[in-house]
Structure formats: C-alpha cells, structure tokens
Amino acid sequence: MRQIKACGVLVVRSNPVESFLLMKHKDRWDLPKGHLDGDETEEECARRELLEETGITADDIELLPGFRWVTEYDVNSKRFGEKCHKTLVIFLGRLKRDVKIVPTEHLDFRWFPWQPPHRIQAQTIDAVLAEAERFLETNK
C-alpha cells in the first residue's frame, strides 16, 4: 500500500487560548493541512499549507516548541486514486496578531470556541484538540 504523509497546523488565538481555526470542506470541518512536497521538512510543509490555505504567514504565527501530534490511518486517496496509508503530523501554532483569513482552497472557515472536550470529528480533530489541551495545561 502506498505511504503518504500530510502535515498541518492547529491554529489557536490568544493566551490563554480562546478559539481555534477550522476550514470548511463540502461535508466536514478540517485543519489547514496537506501533503509533503519533494524533500521539504514536516514543518516546511505545515507552514506552506497554512499559507496556501489561509493566508497566515510564518511571521503571523509561532509554532509552539515541543508539540508534534502524529496519527496514522488508511484513506482512499483522491490524489493517487487508490487506498493509501496516511501519516498525519500536526503542529500547534499560536497567532501573534489578528490576521485576515483567506480561504483559497475551502468553502469557508470558522473560529471555534476553545471549550474542551470537543466533539467535531473523532479520528483526528477531537484527538489533536485533546492532546493540545494537555500540552497547553502542562506548558503554561
């Protein structure tokens, strides 16, 4: 089975966290993320996808050191037209300032209130939010 890797950023606002960003697909909400290109690093991929999908630049956000959430699952890949084993890597990023979100690849976006536990999508979104909550509590 083909192995693929995608990377993205869980974007949060304020300290302490007040809200987090999700992008609207046709039938679901998701994090800004995408596939690794060439020989880029995971962080380079995550930052590139964040810029492409939201307009958030590297200067707008701080990736919090020590947070790197990973999950793996099988997916029917539209990109490759076959079932693939996907590794997803998510970084936690805190905005440094207010920014205008420009959803270039999605229908819309929304800032969801930070009110754990979250019930959005069990496989990835809820799990990464729970891990981010634990990380933020222990790294105040």
Where do the model's predicted regions map?
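NUDIX/MutT-family hydrolases
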Residues: I90-R94, V99-A132
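Conserved Nudix-box catalytic region and its N-terminal flanking loop in Nudix hydrolases
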Residues: P16-T57
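Short connector loops at helix/strand junctions that flank enzyme active sites
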Residues: I4-A6, K26, K83-L88
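Short aromatic/basic micro-patch
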Residues: D30, H85, W111
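Active-site beta-strand termini and strand-to-loop segments that position acidic
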Residues: V11-N15, H25, G93-L95
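Conserved N-terminal beta-strand and adjoining loop/helix that marks the start
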Residues: M1-S19
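Active-site segment of metal-dependent pyrophosphate-handling enzymes
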Residues: I56-D98
